[in-house]
């Protein structure tokens, strides 16, 4: 597990492209047979990819977190973006087809990840945050989610928002997690943009062709910067930063949030004329 530290917005003004990518971009999440995680000190979110092939995989971070087992003091959200598989929680097995999700409550001792077909492995994207209470584990089938349709082709942002770990679906301590799918011909997400000083966010961009690139904009509204991402890369967005993007083709992204509240629409909107 890699550790990333928090940054003051004034510091980011001096960053080169290389420094910006080193601090906020995570490039290698899904590697066959591996668990690749990043621990950001921004609200202590842990996120990353678990890609089992022939062997099951689990997350062992007891020494790094100073606990007896990974979810002793944490909750966990999982969305599978790869082939079919199963997740086993303390002996109970959950089938995970592509884009299925799972909320795992604090106190779950054993979490095992499995792929049905090693040649088409499951790709489990995870978000984990500190938790103070145990809420029930909930399996979230994408077929059972009623997406929010928003945007418009005229503004290149027609999309559907699927809420997974969200008060409309299940209870959680502070974690929120969902998936946004852009329609063909649409490329903009979260524009007009916003910040939310009360919560941080992590974006995972995926379902992109090999030569498709996403342009993720971040920074204070009057001091914006950008990162260029390829398929299955993620970016850390501190609470003071905007988080919006466009791409050379349509794409899908997973958003994960944590912080002071779980109010999805608690945001500070930024007027277009305020962007620099």
Show which residues each predicted segment covers.
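Acidic, low-complexity central loop/insert segments
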Residues: 82-121, 125-130
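A short glycine-rich, His/Asp/Glu-containing loop-to-beta-strand
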Residues: 32-65, 158-201
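Hydrophobic, proline/glycine-rich low-complexity stretches
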Residues: 1-62, 66-71, 75-76, 275
């Amino acid at each position: 597990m890699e550790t990333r530290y928090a940054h003051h917005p004034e510091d980011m003004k001096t960053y080169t492209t290389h420094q910006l990518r080193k601090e906020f971009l995570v490039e290698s999440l899904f590697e066959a047979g591996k668990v690749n995680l990043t621990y950001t000190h921004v609200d202590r979110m842990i996120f990353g990819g678990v890609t089992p092939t022939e062997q099951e995989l689990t997350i062992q971070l007891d020494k790094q977190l100073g606990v007896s087992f990974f979810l002793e003091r944490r909750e966990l959200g999982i969305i599978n973006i790869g082939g079919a598989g199963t997740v086993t929680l303390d002996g109970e097995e959950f089938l995970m087809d592509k884009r299925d999700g799972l909320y795992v409550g604090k106190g779950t001792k054993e979490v095992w990840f499995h792929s049905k077909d090693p040649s088409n492995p499951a790709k489990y994207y995870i978000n984990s945050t500190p938790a103070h209470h145990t809420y029930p584990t909930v399996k979230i089938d994408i077929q059972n989610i009623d997406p929010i349709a928003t945007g418009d082709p005229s503004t290149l942002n027609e999309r559907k928002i699927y809420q997974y770990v969200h008060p409309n679906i299940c209870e959680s301590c502070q974690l929120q997690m969902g998936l946004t799918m852009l329609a063909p011909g649409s490329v903009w997400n979260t524009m007009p943009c916003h910040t939310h000083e009360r919560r941080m966010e992590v974006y995972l961009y995926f379902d992109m062709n090999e030569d498709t690139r996403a342009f993720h904009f971040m920074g204070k509204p009057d001091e914006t910067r950008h990162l260029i991402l390829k398929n299955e890369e993620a970016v850390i967005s501190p609470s003071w930063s905007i988080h919006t993007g466009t791409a050379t083709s349509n794409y899908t992204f997973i958003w994960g949030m944590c912080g002071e509240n779980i109010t999805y629409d608690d945001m500070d909107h930024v007027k277009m004329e305020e962007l620099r």
